[in-house]
Amino acid sequence: PEVLPETADFLRLLREQTERMTQMTKTLLEMSELKTVPCTDRIELAPMVEEIFADLAPLADRNCIILESEGDGVMIGSDTLIYRMLFNLTENSIRYNRPNGTVRIMITDEKNRLVIRVTDTGCGIPEKYRESIFQPFFRVDKSRSRENGGVGLGLSLVWEIVALHGGEVLIEESSEKGTTVAVKLPTDMKTKLL
């Protein structure tokens, strides 16, 4: 039997909303279980960044985004959570970038802290939203976010993961030429506990 165009549109919308709700539920469950995850893995960041770039290559290629990385560092923490944090930051930088833009991850060791800077060439984040973007469900541009998928929890999850590791995350720089998000993490759990 043929489906009427209105019915097909309704079914497509229903499927999209179901997928969005499923993703939101999964993310909320992840956030509620963060504190139970052991943070005892030895993590080499450069290979992890390369893995994230490989995982996000189809999205970057679709948007004509160049992925670059520089530096390395080793830390103690949850391999799974640090991967998720870097993945979310990189994915956002790709999704909200300009066509033919660049996403660059730079890792430096500064006074027993690893500083990971994720820089893009997107349109920037208005100053009044730079702290709010780490709150659950916050979106700078609600219509654009819906086009790009997601449920408004990615950066909130980033903030939670960084806090769990004794670090901080902030918008270091943002203008119409792009944004740099800086994540500062202790290199070991002893530093976290001080």
Which role does the model predict for each range below?
Residues 125-139:
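Short conserved segment of the HATPase_c
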Residues 166-167:
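Conserved glycine-rich
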Residues 2, 30, 34-41, 74-80:
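Conserved micro-motifs of the catalytic ATP-binding
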Residues 13-21:
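Short alpha-helical segment of the dimerization/phosphotransfer core of two-component systems
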Residues 120:
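Acidic ATP/Mg2+-coordinating residue in the GHKL
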Residues 93-94:
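Short helix-loop "hinge" at the ATP-lid/N-box region of the Bergerat-fold HATPase_c
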Residues 41-54:
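A conserved beta-strand-to-alpha-helix junction within the catalytic ATP-binding
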